[in-house]
């Protein structure tokens, strides 16, 4: 209740953040509609090969996030942040409007790369602006909570909105909704007075990554990114196998399982500001790593079940635990980025986090999918548990060499 009151006050009093948050929500809803529409478009063009098309599109997305983001950040270093954000939104909107007219798989790949390259420009730039807009540490923590809630709610709400719209329109029209989300986002940014951007004098694409590799504080965060990637890959890639193959459930049962993961994440995000009044972000995030490892370990046991009420309860509980653990890491991670950067280095640091965190998925997605397909879900969960455990222990060791962050009391 207290967290909700703080959030309401911040949204009411901080006009700039309110507009930027609205822009984020609009863009996220557009992205959610795009996910549904893209799946239907892939099936319309490729039929039974739609899964391969979407898998390739996901790989293209990760490549854009990992490799394009640092390059674009360096190229746009001297430009006003508003111009960068609005241009990225315009490119995304125009690309979304083009997708309904494609009739070849390769055209999907090209447009997805353009769209995801624009997203790889928008997201870290947006995240790097927020610390300047919300300078107070406590308020910034609440802003991160709101941002995390927006991501989790989008994953739950967007499919429902898409399903409702598809009862009255064709899936091609969903791309118009996607474009509209990006247009609203651009309009909100245009109408917002952003702090003046202080550009770094010499900015190279690898500057942020070099900084990550030099500092124990950021190296620890990099290790925790791997914990998140391991837990998230288990849920994202293999939920459908647990639900449909192991338990014999339906598509609605899959939504049920993913809903528990999202609910766990949202509950954890809501409590982060309160917890950080009594402990520091290192302890909170390392605890989150332990929770995530416990969740992946529990998944090995769940994979041996074959359905029935107890199996569904075990799955719901495990997925909730995974959501809680990943959110305990994700939600406060930007606090470390803010602490380890200044006005001139913030863009490169946030971009490096964006790039490196997604690079971890290039490892965990194949592990979850290929190991699960070849050796079974028990082995896949066990391998991901081992990977997450090693990453969590590495983070703890790295952070033991740094000074504990100061606890910010209420």
Where are these regions (language model features)?
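MFS 12-TM fold signature
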Residues: 61, 91-96, 181-185, 291-299, ...
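Transmembrane alpha-helix termini and helix-breaking/packing motifs in multi-pass membrane transporters
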Residues: 39-46, 98-101, 157-177, 245-246, ...
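A single, central transmembrane helix in multi-pass transporters
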Residues: 25, 29-37, 168-176, 210-271, ...
């Amino acid at each position: 209740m207290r967290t909700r009151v703080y959030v309401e006050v911040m949204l009411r009093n901080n006009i700039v953040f309110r507009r930027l948050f609205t822009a984020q929500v609009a863009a996220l809803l557009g992205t959610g509609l795009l996910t549904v529409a893209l799946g239907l478009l892939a099936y319309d063009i490729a039929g039974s090969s739609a899964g391969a098309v979407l898998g390739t599109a996901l790989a293209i997305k990760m490549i854009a996030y990992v490799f394009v983001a640092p390059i674009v950040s360096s190229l746009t270093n001297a430009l006003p942040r508003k111009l960068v954000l609005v241009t990225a939104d315009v490119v995304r909107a125009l690309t979304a409007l083009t997708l309904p007219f494609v009739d070849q798989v390769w055209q999907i790949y090209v447009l997805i790369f353009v769209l995801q390259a624009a997203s790889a420009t928008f997201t870290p730039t947006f995240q790097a602006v927020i610390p300047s807009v919300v300078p107070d540490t406590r308020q910034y923590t609440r802003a991160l909570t709101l941002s995390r809630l927006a991501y989790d709610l989008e994953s739950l709400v967007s499919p429902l909105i898409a399903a409702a719209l598809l009862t009255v329109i064709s899936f091609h029209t969903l791309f118009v909704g996607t474009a509209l989300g990006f247009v609203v986002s651009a309009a909100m940014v245009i109408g917002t007075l952003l702090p003046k951007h202080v550009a770094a004098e010499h900015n190279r694409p690898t500057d942020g990554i070099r900084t990550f590799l030099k500092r124990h504080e950021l190296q620890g965060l990099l290790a925790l990114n791997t914990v998140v990637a391991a837990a998230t890959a288990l849920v994202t890639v293999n939920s459908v196998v647990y639900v449909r193959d192991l338990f014999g459930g339906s598509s609605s049962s899959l939504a049920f399982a993913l809903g528990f993961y999202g609910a766990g994440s949202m509950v954890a995000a809501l409590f982060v500001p309160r917890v950080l009044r009594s402990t520091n972000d290192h302890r909170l995030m390392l605890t989150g790593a332990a929770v995530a490892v416990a969740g992946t370990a529990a998944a090995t046991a769940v994979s041996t079940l074959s359905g029935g009420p107890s199996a569904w309860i075990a799955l719901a509980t495990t997925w909730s635990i995974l959501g809680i653990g990943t959110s305990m890491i994700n939600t406060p991670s930007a606090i470390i980025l803010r602490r380890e950067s200044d006005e001139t280095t913030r863009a490169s640091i946030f971009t490096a986090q964006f790039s490196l965190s997604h690079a971890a998925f290039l490892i965990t997605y194949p592990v979850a999918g290929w190991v699960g397909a070849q050796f079974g879900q028990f082995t896949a969960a066990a391998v991901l548990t081992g990977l997450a455990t090693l990453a969590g222990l590495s983070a703890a060791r790295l952070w033991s060499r740094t000074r504990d962050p100061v606890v910010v009391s209420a």
